Amino acid sequence: MSGHSKWHNIQAKKGKMDAKRGKIFTKIGKEIAVAVKEGGANLDGNSRLKDAVAKAKAANMPNDNIQRAIKKAAGEGDSVNYESIVYEGYGPSGVAVMVEVLTDNKNRSAGNVRSAFTKGGGNMGTSGCVGFMFQKKGEIVIEKAELDEDEIMMMALDAGAEDFASEEEVFIVTTSPEDFGTVREALEAEGLEFLEAAVKMIPDTETAINEDDAKKFQKMLDLLEDDDDVQEVYHNAEFPEGWDE
């Protein structure tokens, strides 16, 4: 499956994440809050909360922050109700884009997302216009470092992974959404740490874009990722060689 090129430069990726760490933690905290309100504060009985906590750990969110978010959502301190919405549309060159939002104000979110699409040379479409181009999959990204490829591959496949890929700096483990938690926990039990661990939408194919369109599309991505309501942005753009997304 495509969509993994962003891991070609681990240090650049980590640097970008460090710069946005506060915003990333806030967004993950919102996911934790929604998970607790839906299924309670007990990790063992709430798979959505387990997934959110795994995502938090992969982003190096301190355990104190994680526990504080869980306690706040479980108590009376957080009365905000968030709605989950997925917006779909197109970027430059017909790139397919899906935007996952958690919001307490649909009108605000719709306006902000539409504006980001327009400013980035694209347009927001109707529900379902690009969703069929993606598959929902669990994805676990592990930095290679000194790890043995065959050993990690066997661990992943034995745990129930669908696919294992070795890229320049990372191993990428792909699972079905249903098996994601089981595979993630099996790899965690082996002492592995993750750069990323989440259920996401992965494109079936990629759309190549030139440098001019890449600049426009990067503007769209930056606007969306800076929006407090936007949790995730998925797309099928293939950036030009050497482009640092």
Swiss-Prot record:
Protein name: Probable transcriptional regulatory protein CPE1954
Lineage: Bacteria, Bacillati, Bacillota, Clostridia, Eubacteriales
One Pfam family recorded for the sequence: TACO1_YebC_N
Originating organism: Clostridium perfringens (strain 13 / Type A)
InterPro entries registered for this protein in UniProt: Integrase-like_N, TACO1_YebC-like_2nd/3rd_dom, TACO1_YebC_N, Transcrip_reg_TACO1-like, Transcrip_reg_TACO1-like_dom3, YebC-like
A molecular function (GO) term: DNA binding
Subcellular location: Cytoplasm
Family: Belongs to the TACO1 family.
Keyword Acetylation: no
Record-level GO BP terms: regulation of DNA-templated transcription
Entry GO CC: cytosol
